[in-house]
C-alpha cells in the first residue's frame, strides 16, 4: 500500500498547469527543457553585528522561523578597519531552500508577505541576472506571518534570490509570472 506524500499547492500547480503553459508559449523540443524552480536563497545581512555579537543569532532565529530551516551564520571574509570588522566575525545568516520547503516559502512570499509590504508597487521586472535567476530585497522582515510584530526589537532586511533552470531572462520571467509574481508593468 503506497503512502500519499504531501505535495505543496504550488508544485501541484506547476505540474498540472504551468508546465503546459510554458510548453505552449516557448514550444520546447524536449519536456526536460521546460524551466523549473531550482532553489531559493535567503540572505540576511546584519550591519550592527560589529557592535553586538548577539544580533546575528537573533537574526538567524527570525530567519529560521521564516524559512522553516536552520540558517548558516555567515562570517566576514576579511577585516575592514573602517567598519570595525574583523575576519571571522559573524555578520549575517543565510538559508538555501529546495523541494517542499521552497514551494511552501514561495507560496507564503507571493500570497501573504508581498501584499503586506508598505507602498508595494510590484517587483522590478529588470531584476534578472541574464541567466534566469531573479533577485529581490525586502526591507522589513515583519511582513512574514511567522514573525510576531510585538516581540521584534529590530527590523531586518533580507535578499531573496529565486534560482530557476531557465536559460534566459524571458523564460524565467514567464515562469515566475505563472507563479503569480506581481511584476511591475
Swiss-Prot record:
Stored Gene3D superfamilies: 3.30.1440.10
Disulfide-bond pairs as recorded: none
SUPFAM superfamilies from the UniProt entry: RL5-like
GO biological process: translation
InterPro entries: Ribosomal_uL5, Ribosomal_uL5_bac-type, Ribosomal_uL5_C, Ribosomal_uL5_CS, Ribosomal_uL5_dom_sf, Ribosomal_uL5_N
GO molecular function: rRNA binding; structural constituent of ribosome; tRNA binding
Keyword terms, alphabetized: Ribonucleoprotein, Ribosomal protein, RNA-binding, rRNA-binding, tRNA-binding
A Pfam family matched in the record: Ribosomal_L5_C
Any single Gene Ontology cellular-component annotation: ribonucleoprotein complex
PANTHER family reported in the protein's UniProt record: 60S RIBOSOMAL PROTEIN L11-RELATED
Record NCBIfam families: PRK00010.1
Similarity section: Belongs to the universal ribosomal protein uL5 family.
Function text: This is one of the proteins that bind and probably mediate the attachment of the 5S RNA into the large ribosomal subunit, where it forms part of the central protuberance. In the 70S ribosome it contacts protein S13 of the 30S subunit (bridge B1b), connecting the 2 subunits; this bridge is implicated in subunit movement. Contacts the P site tRNA; the 5S rRNA and some of its associated proteins might help stabilize positioning of ribosome-bound tRNAs.
Quaternary structure and partners: Part of the 50S ribosomal subunit; part of the 5S rRNA/L5/L18/L25 subcomplex. Contacts the 5S rRNA and the P site tRNA. Forms a bridge to the 30S subunit in the 70S ribosome.
Name used for this protein in its record: Large ribosomal subunit protein uL5
Amino acid at each position: 500500500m503506497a503512502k500519499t506524500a504531501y505535495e505543496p499547492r504550488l508544485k501541484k500547480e506547476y505540474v498540472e498547469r504551468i508546465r503546459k503553459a510554458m510548453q505552449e508559449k516557448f514550444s520546447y523540443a524536449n519536456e526536460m527543457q521546460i524551466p523549473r524552480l531550482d532553489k531559493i536563497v535567503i540572505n540576511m545581512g546584519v550591519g550592527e553585528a560589529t557592535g553586538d555579537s548577539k544580533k546575528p543569532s537573533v537574526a538567524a532565529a527570525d530567519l529560521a522561523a521564516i524559512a522553516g530551516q536552520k540558517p548558516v551564520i555567515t562570517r566576514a571574509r576579511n577585516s575592514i578597519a573602517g567598519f570595525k570588522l574583523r575576519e571571522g566575525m559573524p555578520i549575517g545568516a543565510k538559508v538555501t531552500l529546495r523541494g517542499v520547503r521552497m514551494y511552501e516559502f514561495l507560496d507564503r512570499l507571493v500570497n501573504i508577505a508581498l501584499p503586506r509590504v508598505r507602498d508595494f508597487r510590484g517587483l522590478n521586472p529588470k531584476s534578472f541576472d541574464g541567466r534566469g535567476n531573479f533577485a529581490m530585497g525586502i526591507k522589513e522582515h515583519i511582513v512574514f506571518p511567522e514573525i510576531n510584530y510585538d516581540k521584534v526589537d529590530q527590523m531586518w532586511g533580507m535578499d531573496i534570490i529565486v534560482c530557476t533552470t531557465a536559460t534566459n531572462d524571458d523564460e524565467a520571467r514567464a515562469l515566475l509570472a505563472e507563479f503569480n509574481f506581481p511584476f511591475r508593468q
